[in-house]
Amino acid sequence: MGYTFIRKIVFVLATLLLSLKGVSQPYVDIVNTSAQSLQSNYKDALNSKNTTTDYFLNLTIPLVLDSQNTFIVRFYGENLQSTIKNDLYTQTYNLYSTLLPIGLQHETKNRKWKFMGLVMPKLSSDFKAKISSYDLQVGGYGLATYALNKKLKIKAGLFYNREFFGNFFVPLFSIDWDATDRLKLYGVLPTTYRIEYALVKQKLYAGLAFKSYTRSYRLSDANHDYVKNVELQTKAFLDVYIKKKFVLFAEFGRTIGYSPLAYLYQTKTEAQYIPIYTKIQDAFFFNVGLALRIRNDFK
């Protein structure tokens, strides 16, 4: 029985490695969990303090159909916990989202082109009331990658989501470059981009990164008003491989214009009656996490 279990594990890992063949960024996280925390001040007369902790859980399951096609199932979960504190009161509020991207990746026979398409249904709410269509968002993601050579790839595409504030389109473009056997640049702009350097190959990696992540959440008990969260980050990161496929990572950076803000239903008018979701000052943040990661540049 133990031998059969080991064979299954070996088969799963072999399948995942096959699915990474031709992937432009150097790794895929099969499981990734992290917690990001920041402390800031509100721009109010009470000198209120803000503490925000963001918990993430991400899963990726690539299933190889044949030498050119891979079926992809992903799951993203988030819990955004915000606290406001001043001399009069302390209040904590939680927002949640669950995203289930499903799609296909196709690579041409000559390995020059790769196309990925995902349908992305999402529930995003405080979940204080029964789940309904008011909590549902539906989006899509399309990305084409062209390999100029083994070290240089160009990517272009489009992201769309039906947010609670309206239709949200993001054109995508990027260049992945293996500058040396230690230095890599990769990502998809304007959402994420990394400059990564291998301090100790297969053990220790560090670098600089940028992240842009816009999303919205329904406030169920407040006439379906919503919170819009525009998150821009610049940060430094450190990845420590405690085992070949297990990585402990840490990030330290600064927010740019970060403020989860509440708005009235079907408007772009700020809902001032919810002080916890009013403007805060930019702040430094710290993020730590653990991932089951498979890199295509590990021997």
Model segments located where?
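Sequence/structural signature of outer-membrane beta-barrel proteins
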Residues: L38-K43, E78-D87, E107, M120-K130, ...
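Outer-membrane beta-barrel translocator/channel fold
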Residues: P62-V64, G77-T90, L189-F286
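Residue-level signature of outer-membrane beta-barrel architecture
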Residues: I61-L63, L104-T108, Y146, W177, ...
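Repeated loop/turn-to-beta-strand initiation elements of outer-membrane beta-barrel proteins
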Residues: D66-F71, N110-F115, K151-A156, R182-L185, ...
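Outer-membrane beta-barrel "beta-signal"
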Residues: L172-W177, L238, K279-K299
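Transmembrane beta-barrel strands of outer-membrane/channel proteins
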Residues: I30-S37, V73-N79, G117-L123, A156-Y160, ...
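Residues that define the transmembrane beta-barrel architecture of outer-membrane proteins
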Residues: K49-Y55, T92-L100, S132-V138, N167-P171, ...
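Short glycine/proline- and aromatic-enriched beta-strand/turn motifs that initiate or cap beta-hairpins
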Residues: S24-K85, R295
